[in-house]
Amino acid sequence: MPIEHEIDHRRRLVLAKGHGTLTDAEVFHYQRVWSRPEVAGYDELFDMSDVADITPPSTERIRELAQLSAAMDALSPSRLAIVAPNDLPFALGRMYETHRGLDKRSTKTVNVFRSVEDALAWLGSERSVT
């Protein structure tokens, strides 16, 4: 499975990890996690450290994903940390961050990091992701 996720209810955190080749269709499919009421308002860490290849999405698809995500946001603010140690995923993450920030419906603050440790520090999580 290219994107695995785990829900940590104690920390109110969704931990997602990409593997292998990642496509935009898989990322859109992953958004179904956010339609689950029990994770409304949770923070999220999306780790792309193990992604070997990305089928580059168009700018329009990144905008569509950001709009879909913003429309699914809970009323309470939350945060999304994207971990992208390599340049292409980092750039795509920054594009997504920008589009999310431009959507007035968005209640989720997005930030992109090169390391899991920096992402966890920003999220305020004390434990590492295993």
Regions found by a protein language model. Give the residues of each.
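Amphipathic, Lys/Arg-enriched alpha-helical "gate/interface" segment within cytosolic domains
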Residues: 1-130
